[in-house]
């Protein structure tokens, strides 16, 4: 999910100087019991010793013939419908990419105290790794089967979200079920100049075209541990430099991130990488600009933007001197554009989230009161979109929803767009700043 830069920072003059491709195969190791029977026939005409030897020989032969039957290895279905805990019955979910700390923090890798602190976070890591593996399996299915020219955005979004719900084992139709595990951020399908926060509302008929550049941004959570990750799809190779620039910029941000690293240093490195690329369309070259008012961000439990003490990770130089700290979780995301490199609110809103720790506000509309109660019980502070309300059987809720927004109880996140005619791209990963190593929890073979 994109975090916006404060307006005063966005206005800075920046022109002077940017696991696993397939579902893991798991053998359950189950074995069938030997069914061999001891059938040694006695021969009255033979002596006892000879008969015994013959029986023993027959037993050995039968034992050799009786082989253990192997159960078929379990793999994820297509579409993904097998809960991840079935594929990983011992909850031994795959690690993300493990990166050792460098320079002044290199001691953390072998420091016994730091390793002990890390081992204390076992439940935290298990929940994050489960969410990350679900994200990998669903997104790789989406890339192969859902995201194609001619597909509707609604079909793509619902295909992704259905996969996430099945793999978590929580369909979210019962009160509170979505809070156990499920969608951590609604599926954003942002086309061309639209950079973030666009998801199809009910009745949307938009069809993906061959010449489109689409950002796919969604989150998965287990017990509020949100994995926020995004990628960009383009079918025309003319857009490859744009995708490469943004992917490399994100990887630069991940490489630079670490304990005690200043946000300003990360932003400068990201911008330098991204803006070393350009895109040529029909003989015209377009410099690729970092979108200066979009940022990465901390992630808190059940809070996509890390709560009141959340931090932002700029993608341009000139940011503040705030440092990253041990134990924090970050979404490192970058956006590149062939336009102005600045986004504004545009189009119909689909994304919303309850404001954490909002003050008590008297609500006069009964529709707003009822809707707020439903949001609390089903989403808490997790972001949601209008389709999720439709799915829960809500009708004619817009008046109440707008009242909650105007009352300061719910935040609306309109789509964020650069100028029309431009193209934008996004790549994003979630990283954990563990005491002894940095883990890129959402890393996969795809990006």
Swiss-Prot record:
Molecular function as annotated in GO:
initiator methionyl aminopeptidase activity; metal ion binding; metalloaminopeptidase activity
Sorted alphabetically, the keyword list is: Aminopeptidase, Cytoplasm, Hydrolase, Metal-binding, Protease
The Basic residues compositionally biased stretches are: 59-73
* Chief location of this protein within or outside the cell: cytoplasm
Residue span of region Disordered: 1-89
Recorded hits in CDD domains, A to Z, give: MetAP2 (cd01088)
Q: What is its EC number?
A: 3.4.11.18
Q: How is the cofactor bound?
A: Binds 2 divalent metal cations per subunit. Has a high-affinity and a low affinity metal-binding site. The true nature of the physiological cofactor is under debate. The enzyme is active with cobalt, zinc, manganese or divalent iron ions. Most likely, methionine aminopeptidases function as mononuclear Fe(2+)-metalloproteases under physiological conditions, and the catalytically relevant metal-binding site has been assigned to the histidine-containing high-affinity site.
Q: Which residues fall in a compositionally biased region of kind Acidic residues?
A: 34-47
Q: Which cofactor does it need?
A: Co(2+); Zn(2+); Mn(2+); Fe(2+)
Q: What reaction is this protein's catalytic activity?
A: Release of N-terminal amino acids, preferentially methionine, from peptides and arylamides
- Give the source's domain of life in one word: Eukaryota
Please tell me where a divalent metal cation 2 binds in this chain. Answer: 228, 297, 333, 428
The residues that the entry says bind substrate are 197, 305
* PROSITE patterns referenced in this protein's UniProt entry, alphabetically: MAP_2
UniProt subcellular location: Cytoplasm
Entry binding sites for a divalent metal cation 1: 217, 228, 428
The question of whether Nucleotide-binding is a record keyword is answered with no
Report the top EC class in one word: hydrolase
Bias (Polar residues) occurs at 15-30
GO biological process assignments: proteolysis
An annotated GO cellular component of this protein is: cytoplasm
NCBIfam families per record = met_pdase_II (TIGR00501)
Could you tell me what this protein does? Cotranslationally removes the N-terminal methionine from nascent proteins. The N-terminal methionine is often cleaved when the second residue in the primary sequence is small and uncharged (Met-Ala-, Cys, Gly, Pro, Ser, Thr, or Val).
Q: Which family does it belong to?
A: Belongs to the peptidase M24A family. Methionine aminopeptidase eukaryotic type 2 subfamily.
By what name is this protein known? Methionine aminopeptidase 2-2
